[in-house]
Every structure is written in structure tokens, then in C-alpha cells.
């Protein structure tokens, strides 16, 4: 696979693709020459697949993103994201974020018009975040503007600068849980070696997510 993309799971209905920083989830302006996820993916896979983007990550965000492998799967994921409950194919999206301040509360729900985010602190400067809705910049806005805890290297929302790291913020799509019928499947997505600079204070010596953070990411409910 490309150094920018890596298929970490390939199933019947969907795949999980690791997206590196600098890759767009959807085409930008005509003048934007950065690679686009779906175009890159179609160019890399040998077989011709009917692929649909389900989960969109900002270009500066790393980690796992869900790609449906047929139109029906895309429709079923979309139905769940719009209606929730038992409709469609269930999808839980959890992220790891390093932040510039410690939240006042260890866990909670952040709400603003049309947006709901859950969070749980796992380190003084690190939280696990779960999306209920998925609006543009939702996590970045909620952490910075509602919790006063901007994400490290996210200068757009007031985060501190990490020298030598450009085009990447300390926000990583680390866990995806799907439910298709009675089948529930968990996908833990680590941080690739070339993108670990922002995470060195969190990761183990081997560059892995530590056990306590994995337990929080994979628990049934965040709180």
C-alpha cells in the first residue's frame, strides 16, 4: 500500500483504511494538490470495487476511516448516522486527543447546536472522544471552545505549536465499532511510526497504545 494509506481491515461490507495526515477525505479546491482518500485508494487496489466514504477525517487528522464496499452498505451506515438506534449498520467512532489543558471534569457530554460529543480523560493531557454527531471540525471545536482544551498543534483553534510537525494535529481516529445485524466487530487502529512525534508522551516504548487507553477506547460505553 501507499505510505499515506493502509488497509487495516477488509471485510465483506466495509474496510478500515488508515489515513495519514495530509490526505483529504474529499476533494478540496481545484488549487489544492493534496491527495484525496478515495482516488488514492481506487488507484492502489488491484480489483475494481464500488467504494463509498462513510467516515470523513480532516486532512490534519490521522487514523482509521470506514469505507463501504457497496452502495447498500454505504446507505445502511448513513441511515444509522442519521437516525441512530437500531436502524442501519451501527457505527461507533472514538478518537484519541492530546490537549493543552486538563478538563475540569474527567468525563462528560459536550453539546452545541446540532453537535454532541462525549469525552473521558485518560491522562492529564489526553482524552478519548466519541462522536454522536459528525459535523465539520466538531471535536476540534468542542475541545477548544467548550472545554478550553485545544488540541496540541491545532493552531487554527489555539493549540500549542510542536516544532517540526506540519499538517498534523494530535487527534487520531483510534477505534471503530460496527454492528451489522447481530454481528458486532471492534477495530483498534494504532498510530503509524512516521506520525508518532505528537504522541511520544503517551505511547509505549514500542510505539503502541498503552493498555489503560486501549481499555477505555474499547469499553462498551465511554461512561
Curated annotation (Swiss-Prot):
Phylogenetic lineage: Eukaryota, Fungi, Dikarya, Ascomycota, Saccharomycotina
Compartment(s) where it occurs, according to its Swiss-Prot or TrEMBL record: Mitochondrion
GO cellular component, one term: mitochondrion
Top-level taxonomic group: Eukaryota
Pfam families in the record: PseudoU_synth_2 (PF00849)
Reaction catalysed by this enzyme: uridine(2819) in 21S rRNA = pseudouridine(2819) in 21S rRNA
Protein's GO biological process: enzyme-directed rRNA pseudouridine synthesis
Protein's gene: PUS5
UniProt-recorded Gene Ontology molecular function terms: 21S rRNA pseudouridine(2819) synthase activity; pseudouridylate synthase activity; RNA binding
Active site annotation, chain numbering: 58
The keyword Transferase belongs to this UniProt entry's keyword annotation: no
Reported function: Pseudouridylate synthase responsible for the pseudouridine-2819 formation in mitochondrial 21S rRNA. May modulate the efficiency or the fidelity of the mitochondrial translation machinery.
Enzyme type, top EC level: isomerase
Family of the protein in this entry: Belongs to the pseudouridine synthase RluA family.
Name recorded for this polypeptide: 21S rRNA pseudouridine(2819) synthase
Keywords: Isomerase, Mitochondrion, rRNA processing
Enzyme Commission no: 5.4.99.43
Disulfide topology: none
Amino acid at each position: 500500500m501507499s505510505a499515506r494509506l493502509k488497509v487495516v481491515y477488509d471485510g465483506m461490507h466495509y474496510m478500515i483504511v488508515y489515513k495519514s495526515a495530509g490526505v483529504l477525505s474529499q476533494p478540496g479546491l481545484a488549487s489544492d494538490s493534496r491527495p484525496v482518500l478515495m482516488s488514492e485508494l481506487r488507484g492502489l487496489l488491484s480489483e475494481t470495487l464500488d467504494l463509498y466514504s462513510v467516515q470523513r477525517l480532516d486532512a490534519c487528522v490521522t487514523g482509521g476511516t470506514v469505507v463501504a464496499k457497496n452502495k447498500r452498505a454505504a446507505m445502511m451506515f448513513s441511515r444509522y448516522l442519521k437516525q441512530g438506534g437500531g436502524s442501519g449498520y451501527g457505527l461507533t467512532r472514538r478518537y484519541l486527543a492530546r490537549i493543552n489543558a486538563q478538563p475540569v471534569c474527567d468525563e462528560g457530554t459536550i453539546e452545541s447546536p446540532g453537535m454532541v460529543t462525549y469525552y473521558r480523560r485518560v491522562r492529564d493531557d489526553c482524552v478519548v472522544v466519541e462522536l454522536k454527531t459528525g459535523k465539520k471540525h466538531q471535536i476540534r471545536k468542542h475541545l477548544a471552545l467548550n472545554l478550553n482544551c485545544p488540541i496540541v498543534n491545532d493552531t487554527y483553534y489555539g493549540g500549542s505549536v510542536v516544532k517540526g510537525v506540519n499538517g498534523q494535529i494530535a487527534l487520531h481516529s483510534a477505534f471503530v465499532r460496527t454492528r451489522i445485524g447481530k454481528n458486532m466487530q471492534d477495530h483498534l487502529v494504532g498510530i503509524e511510526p512516521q506520525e508518532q512525534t505528537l504522541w511520544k508522551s503517551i505511547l509505549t516504548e514500542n510505539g503502541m497504545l498503552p493498555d489503560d487507553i486501549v481499555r477505555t477506547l474499547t469499553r462498551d460505553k465511554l461512561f
